[in-house]
């Protein structure tokens, strides 16, 4: 499953050059990922209630075109890969038909002590049902 999360670029997200600061995209990816989980019926609060977290262990972004204050952008998000302990999400950030950025995050399932653990069947089943391995 793929979602598109709309975002209105705020002034605070821009830098001295008048474009969105590169770090703002990381915040947008997180917001889109959390929304993706909501939409598949697996809110992140439910994952945390089981004493688990999906820590970001790798992140990659390629910036194609700048976004500016006042732009309306959308973050396209999908789960690309799932293993027994890790997940990989893919993202594209759009302004209309213009691709602004594309990237990925990789996550490790951890318990409350920060130890790597297997993703429980109730979570892995929900995730697998919405896996989209091709872009």
Features from the language model and the residues they span:
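Catalytic strand-loop segment that frames the active site of acyl-thioester-processing enzymes
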Residues: 1-38
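HotDog/MaoC-like acyl-thioester-processing domains
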Residues: 1-5, 38, 68-72, 79-135
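A residue-level detector for short acidic-glycine micro-motifs
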Residues: 11, 63-65, 81
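Short, basic/aromatic beta-hairpin or loop at an interaction surface
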Residues: 47-54
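Short structured motifs
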Residues: 57-63, 75-76, 90
């Amino acid at each position: 499953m793929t979602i598109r999360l709309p975002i209105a670029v705020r002034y605070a997200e821009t830098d001295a050059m008048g474009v969105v600061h590169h770090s703002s995209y990381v915040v947008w990816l997180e917001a889109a990922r959390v929304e993706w989980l909501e939409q598949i019926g697996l809110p992140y609060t439910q994952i945390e209630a089981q004493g688990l977290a999906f820590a970001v262990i790798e992140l990659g972004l390629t910036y194609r075109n700048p976004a500016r204050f006042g732009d309306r952008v959308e973050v396209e998000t999908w789960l690309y890969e799932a293993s027994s302990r890790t997940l990989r999400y893919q993202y594209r950030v759009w302004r209309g038909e213009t691709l602004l950025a594309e990237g990925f995050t990789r996550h490790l399932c951890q318990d409350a002590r920060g130890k790597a653990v297997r993703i429980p069947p109730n979570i892995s089943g929900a995730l697998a049902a919405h896996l989209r391995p091709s872009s």
